[in-house]
């Protein structure tokens, strides 16, 4: 079955000389990627070689950039990397994978950009940021700060 599907893809590519399908899919994936990242409040570094089929967000990188090293140390000391994706699923009904299962950083999360609508990726971006901000609020409360 896989060989047949590969043969059909190859045959289709021979007929689509202008790469219309390929360009359409690449545009769709980029729009989804942009929609997700724009709604995290994080900056997506341009990469002309990015395939974009999956996107990985390293939560620890953004924890440090947004709240500092002290917050990042708090996260590592008080939570397991899987807690983030579990918290995300419980609070927002968004299910993402932990990136370490794909040889990514322990505190990374991974989203497939292949199967949801663009608006769903906006929700994912907002949900990821919401959970990170909730952890930061817990950290501030633990330090005795109110906000």
Where do the protein language model's features map onto the residues?
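PLP-dependent class I/II
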Residues: 1-147
């Amino acid at each position: 079955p896989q060989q047949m599907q590969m043969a059909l893809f190859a045959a289709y590519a021979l007929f689509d000389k202008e790469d219309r399908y390929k360009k359409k899919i690449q545009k769709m994936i980029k729009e989804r990627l942009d929609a997700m990242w724009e709604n995290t409040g994080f900056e997506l570094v341009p990469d002309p070689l990015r395939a974009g089929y999956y996107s990985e967000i390293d939560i620890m990188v953004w924890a440090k950039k947004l709240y500092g090293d002290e917050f990042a140390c708090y996260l590592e000391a008080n939570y397991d990397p899987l807690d983030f994706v579990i918290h995300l699923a419980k609070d927002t009904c968004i299910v993402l994978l932990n990136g370490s299962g794909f040889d990514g950083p322990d505190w990374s999360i991974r989203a497939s950009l292949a199967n949801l609508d663009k608006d769903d990726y906006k929700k994912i971006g907002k949900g990821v940021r919401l959970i990170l901000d909730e952890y930061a609020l817990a950290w501030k409360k633990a330090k005795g700060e109110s906000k």
